[in-house]
Amino acid sequence: MKARLLVLLCALAATDADTICIGYHANNSTDTVDTVLEKNVTVTHSVNLLEDSHNGKLCRLKGIAPLQLGKCNIAGWILGNPECESLLSERSWSYIVETPNSENGTCYPGDFIDYEELREQLSSVSSFERFEIFSKESSWPKHTTGGVTAACSHAGKSSFYRNLLWLTEKDGSYPNLNNSYVNKKGKEVLVLWGVHHPSNIKDQQTLYQKENAYVSVVSSNYNRRFTPEIAERPKVRGQAGRINYYWTLLKPGDTIMFEANGNLIAPWYAFALSRGFGSGIITSNASMHECDTKCQTPQGAINSSLPFQNIHPVTIGECPKYVRSTKLRMVTGLRNIPSIQSRGLFGAIAGFIEGGWTGMIDGWYGYHHQNEQGSGYAADQKSTQNAINGITNKVNSVIEKMNTQFTAVGKEFNNLEKRMENLNKKVDDGFLDIWTYNAELLVLLENERTLDFHDSNVKNLYEKVKNQLRNNAKEIGNGCFEFYHKCNNECMESVKNGTYDYPKYSEESKLNREKIDGVKLESMGVYQILAIYSTAASSLVLLVSLGAISFWMCSNGSLQCRICI
């Protein structure tokens, strides 16, 4: 019996066998990603797809400065409000900047017809040529061209728009006028004019020498006849009269004709337009700085190659797509679950089931071995590189497909188009929700696939080792194998590179397996003997105890015993 127990203890003491484990990289990263099934999964590596920062500045766009309207708005600039005179020299720009509270627009009160459409047209213009369409000195010889008003005062004196002429009577007469212009600029020409509506007949007769007047404007695409509406109105900027402002785009080679017998606010300067990709109009209080950018928002410039941003829906230039997301992070590495580096009964290192290895820094997947010569980590470079190439190509493909750089400007609606504006906002919100949903779903799905891909690669590496070793080693859990033979560093390297010589070690493994199996049988015999002795001893103790209790109870009369023959 003693000999058998000694054999068992010796066998248990001699099982410090060589081992090899398959596992994956872990590090101290705190990056988290979301997948379809999980949230906030900690991973070793990831890339951010969502830009959420800007510099708070207005910058040059591709080296070209914006047109800052300052205290003027589009109307004041394009009509030539005297307070916007400094803008008359501007010829080109990358984008146009209005401030939210610009005060200088139409100085003489009235309606700017189709103003929102004009803003939309100008948002795609990157430069223009301002030229005299009708000469102030020679085009209207029978009319006075110096009409001014206190509503458009400048430097304390009455003045008028720098791009329009207020034609009035001359020497007590206002003869019919008829003038035309042929567009020979080779590009679209923006022409502006106005129609004056006095507040009373007296002003009408004083200015135009007649009570009934008309204005006619005709081109190949435009044909309107205007009749002044004479009526008392509340004073605005000290004026009871009104001027309605009009515009049209004249195509190359087209002719525009003006005919009137009063009340015409005639064109003086017009604009030959040059359209450019990426221009636009933004409303911003940000200040201009010495900086360059490829993407400008009202909040500030964005310098990013990421496919998405959540800064502002209005963008100028080559900009990421706006989404409402707060996080779009795509995993490129593995689940980051560093294992507790503890030694077990056989000195095994926790493998890929329990967690990754922070000690393996030169690859994503690899091995940890232990033998008489020592222990160490080694990455499987081939599987790691294949995974890196595949994931890099996938990330680049996703970014390329989603990274459609473009300008997104707000649409213009006037006060009478609120229903249309509200409908447009709902449609835009719907598209924005779809874009946001698609972006988030894409990232969730790709993250799930990437993590599954890594799990599959680790499993494939495990199966590769298992298929080589076959019954020359046994699986001991945690991604580890215990050899039935001695495996030095050369042997370990052959397992890692796939050249393990199974027949070379099969005989030694067979003998060691038989020894271990024999020890198991011997130990089974020992356990059976111990079990029999234990059962017999327990039964004997129980019988003696029962006899003693019975004798005591009989002696004090608690139990009566009768023997019948």
UniProtKB/Swiss-Prot annotation:
One family from Pfam that matches here is Hemagglutinin
- Which domain of life does the protein's organism represent? Viruses
Describe PTMs of this protein. Palmitoylated. In natural infection, inactive HA is matured into HA1 and HA2 outside the cell by one or more trypsin-like, arginine-specific endoprotease secreted by the bronchial epithelial cells. One identified protease that may be involved in this process is secreted in lungs by club cells.
Q: Tell me yes or no: is Secreted among this UniProt entry's keywords.
A: no
The record gives the membrane topology as: Single-pass type I membrane protein
Query: Would you tell me the Gene Ontology cellular component terms?
Result: host cell plasma membrane; membrane; viral envelope; virion membrane
Q: Where are the transmembrane segments?
A: 529-549
Q: Which GO terms describe its molecular function?
A: host cell surface receptor binding
Name its GO BP terms in alphabetical order.
Answer: clathrin-dependent endocytosis of virus by host cell; fusion of virus membrane with host endosome membrane; fusion of virus membrane with host plasma membrane; viral budding from plasma membrane; virion attachment to host cell
Give the signal peptide range: 1-17
Gene3D superfamilies associated with the record: 3.90.20.10, 3.90.209.20, Hemagglutinin Chain A, Domain 2 (2.10.77.10)
* Alphabetical UniProt keywords: Clathrin- and caveolin-independent endocytosis of virus by host, Clathrin-mediated endocytosis of virus by host, Disulfide bond, Fusion of virus membrane with host endosomal membrane, Fusion of virus membrane with host membrane, Glycoprotein, Hemagglutinin, Host cell membrane, Host membrane, Host-virus interaction, Lipoprotein, Membrane, Palmitate, Signal, Transmembrane, Transmembrane helix, Viral attachment to host cell, Viral envelope protein, Viral penetration into host cytoplasm, Virion, Virus endocytosis by host, Virus entry into host cell
Parts of the chain on the Extracellular side: 18-528
The disulfide bridges present are 21-480, 59-291, 72-84, 107-152, 295-319, 487-491
What ranges does the Cytoplasmic topological domain annotation cover? 550-565
- From the Swiss-Prot or TrEMBL record, state where the protein is found: Virion membrane; Host apical cell membrane
Give the matching InterPro entries. Capsid_hemagglutn, Hemagglutn_HA1_a/b_dom_sf, Hemagglutn_influenz_A, Hemagglutn_influenz_A/B
- Lipid attachment site numbers (S-palmitoyl cysteine): 554, 561, 564
Q: Where is this site: Cleavage?
A: 343-344
Positions annotated as glycosylated: 27-28, 40, 104, 178, 285, 303, 497
Which miscellaneous remark does the UniProt record hold? Major glycoprotein, comprises over 80% of the envelope proteins present in virus particle.
Protein family membership: Belongs to the influenza viruses hemagglutinin family.
Assembly, in brief, is: Homotrimer of disulfide-linked HA1-HA2. Interacts with human CACNA1C.
Q: Describe the function of this protein.
A: Binds to sialic acid-containing receptors on the cell surface, bringing about the attachment of the virus particle to the cell. This attachment induces virion internalization either through clathrin-dependent endocytosis or through clathrin- and caveolin-independent pathway. Plays a major role in the determination of host range restriction and virulence. Class I viral fusion protein. Responsible for penetration of the virus into the cell cytoplasm by mediating the fusion of the membrane of the endocytosed virus particle with the endosomal membrane.
Know the name of this protein?
Hemagglutinin
